[in-house]
Regions:
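Short hydrophobic/aromatic beta-strand element in the GNAT-like acyltransferase core
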Residues: 46, 66, 100-101
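Conserved short beta-strand elements that form part of the metal-binding/catalytic scaffold
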Residues: 28-62, 110-115
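Short amphipathic alpha-helices within nucleic acid-binding modules
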Residues: 19-20, 73-78
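N-terminal beta-strand motif that seeds the catalytic metal site of vicinal oxygen chelate
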Residues: 1-15, 63-65, 117-125
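Short glycine-enriched loop/turn motifs at secondary-structure junctions
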Residues: 1-3, 57-62, 94-95
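Vicinal oxygen chelate
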Residues: 80-125
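Core segments of cupin and vicinal oxygen chelate
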Residues: 2, 8-47
Length: 125
């Protein structure tokens, strides 16, 4: 097993995306590499936003970043109060036994806030 996970997203506007993840979502910035900023999402999970280039274009299609929490409703209300527009309200999904809602980041990446209702899901220790 690996020690940590970093997911990188490419952005056309690094300052706008960094403000969204840092100021709006409240994720702590752990490393500023100039063209990339890496935020902590959980004890060993990280999300990096990097300035796109011709070699690494921004391509949000087919990407979903899922942030897992037991407080989906609380996050929904807090982020709505900060002006975030959601694509869906929090709702249950019987097929996957989850409770979730969706929004998009400034580049159009789909962000899901989700809670697993399945007792088999490994909870943080």
């Amino acid at each position: 097993m690996f020690d940590q996970l970093v997911t990188f997203l490419y952005t056309r506007d690094l300052e706008k995306s960094a403000a969204f993840y840092g100021d709006v979502l409240g994720l702590p910035l752990v490393l500023d590499q100039g063209a990339c900023r890496i935020f902590k999402t959980s004890p060993e999970g990280f999300l990096g936003v990097c300035r796109c280039s011709e070699r690494r274009p921004s391509n949000p299609e087919g990407v979903i970043v899922t942030l897992v929490t037991d407080d989906v409703d609380g996050w929904y209300e807090r982020l709505k109060a900060k002006g975030v527009t959601f694509d869906t309200t929090p709702e249950g999904n019987v097929e996957y036994n989850i409770y979730h809602c969706f929004m998009k980041d400034p580049d159009g990446y789909q962000i899901e806030i989700q809670s697993f209702r399945d007792p088999a899901w490994p909870r943080p220790t």
